């Protein structure tokens, strides 16, 4: 028979272990570290990397964070007014959509077309908002979401809840997580063949 003291000690040990696990979960959620980090799906990695290289203002974590916010990496995403992995409206796609995979068609539903088109359009938006006061990345993201005219008219991020939430989520939540995720990816990538780690 287990004494009361033995049961108490056992319960205290179990409670301490549970608190330790909970603390680790909270720290991971607050810092964005650990297995909960978002990652670029392997099938889109090379497309995102090459698209980000086409514009000096872009980088892989920013492109990834924006795609995550737009569609959660779903190439068949359809919000009713925007389509595909990069969520282009039909009007914007007709101007900025390009054939990125070389099959002769600019297809909003094809990530190899949509992701490079997203980079091209974002690069254009950086130029459009260059004279607007504020952070250029936040302004370009706001223009992607609300349209460049809305940003120019507001002389900043327009007072549209959806747009403000979109910019905030990308810049303050997703981008830091993708920066950490990409740093971890880079540190775990095998070294190029023929080189040795010293």
State where each predicted segment sits.
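Cell-wall glycan
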Residues: 39-49, 86-91, 148, 161-198
């Amino acid at each position: 028979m287990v004494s009361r003291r033995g049961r108490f000690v056992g319960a205290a040990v179990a409670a301490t272990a549970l608190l330790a696990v909970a603390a680790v979960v909270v720290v991971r959620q607050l810092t964005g570290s650990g297995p909960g980090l978002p990652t670029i799906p392997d099938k889109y990695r090379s497309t995102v990397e090459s698209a980000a290289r086409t514009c000096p203002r872009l980088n892989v974590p920013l492109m990834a964070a924006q795609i995550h916010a737009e569609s959660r990496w779903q190439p068949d995403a359809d919000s009713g007014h925007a389509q595909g992995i990069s969520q282009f409206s039909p009007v914007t796609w007709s101007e900025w959509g390009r054939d990125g995979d070389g099959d002769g068609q600019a297809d909003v539903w094809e990530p190899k077309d949509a992701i490079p088109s997203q980079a091209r359009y974002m690069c254009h938006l950086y130029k459009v908002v260059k004279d607007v006061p504020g952070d250029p990345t936040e302004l370009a993201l706001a223009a992607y979401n609300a349209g460049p005219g809305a940003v120019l008219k507001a002389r900043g991020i327009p007072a549209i809840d959806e747009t403000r939430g979109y910019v905030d989520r990308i810049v303050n939540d997703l981008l830091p997580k993708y920066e950490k995720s990409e740093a971890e990816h880079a540190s775990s990538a095998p070294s190029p063949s023929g080189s040795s780690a010293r």
